[in-house]
Amino acid sequence: MTQFEIECLDSKVYNARDHWSRFVIDPLKPGQGTTLGNALRRTLLSELEGLAITAVRIAGVSHEFSTINGIREDVLEILLNLKEIVFSGQLQESTIGRLTVQGPAIVTARSFELPPEIKLIDPEQYIATICGNNTLEMEFKIEVGSGYKIVEKDNSTEHFEFLQVDSVFMPVKKVNFRIEETRGENNILNEQLILDIWTNGSISAKEAISNAADNLINLFSPLKTIDGESETDYETNETSHINQILIEELQLSVRAYNCLKRGCAHIHSVADLLDYSQEDLIEIKNFGQKSAEEVIDALQKRLGINLPKEKTTKIYNK
């Protein structure tokens, strides 16, 4: 079977938050272009992770319909401007950013105080204008997610203090594709998939396709293990079978999967994971508590395996 190839035909950077690339994937058999195009488009738009502001606390403000003395924009306009801010970086759990500016001044994202692991894509993004000797002071939550998150009512004390923001996590803004017929060797009819991808600058289109492919591989990998073994045969070979299971079958998030398989740990199977305790997982470089809990939960629910809690004598590359 001829393996298809992907090539970047063209790319442009219109501004810091508007990148475009065009790819061609070929040769494909008739019908494969639509199958591949639909799967990639859906995954690129809805499943890739990104960072976004999800909540804001502004000094002296109790609700989103307030105005701030000496600030040209009302609170709702400021929230809409914050919603458009684009970040990049690796984040395991929510974090806090801050802004304090004394007027008169035009406030942009450049004035943000951010954790070192988070980067601004466009420091010139506009926030507000301060008139006179007034101060704009706020702090905001940054979270990792995918797709679009609509504000949900939350009466907890923490959420009461923060103004919630509809958040756009999607690093890919738009995807178009079309199918063209081509002729291969011996005049055989083939297809080629032309794929146009627009990103917000937090990742490149090439990275987006790679991440989408990882997601699709994780989705379909469990289908490879279907077999006709009887219940007796399965029970006899249960331990051996579990040890041979690849980590793809745990259906982990792309972040956790990449840290295990492509990071310094080089974990490829459940057998490899059994060498680790719960404390060992947390100490894997760039892994973190959230990813460790995801792996522990997947092993327990899918395979009935409970990792020991105590740390082993394993040596880690940090």
Swiss-Prot record:
Stretches for region Alpha C-terminal domain (alpha-CTD): 241-318
GO cellular component, one term: DNA-directed RNA polymerase complex
Segments of this protein annotated with the region Alpha N-terminal domain (alpha-NTD): 1-227
Keywords attached to this entry: Chloroplast, DNA-directed RNA polymerase, Nucleotidyltransferase, Plastid, Transcription, Transferase
One BP annotation, GO: DNA-templated transcription
Keyword Transferase part of the UniProt annotation: yes
UniProt xrefs under HAMAP family: RNApol_bact_RpoA
Full protein name: DNA-directed RNA polymerase subunit alpha
Species whose genome carries this gene: Guillardia theta (Cryptophyte)
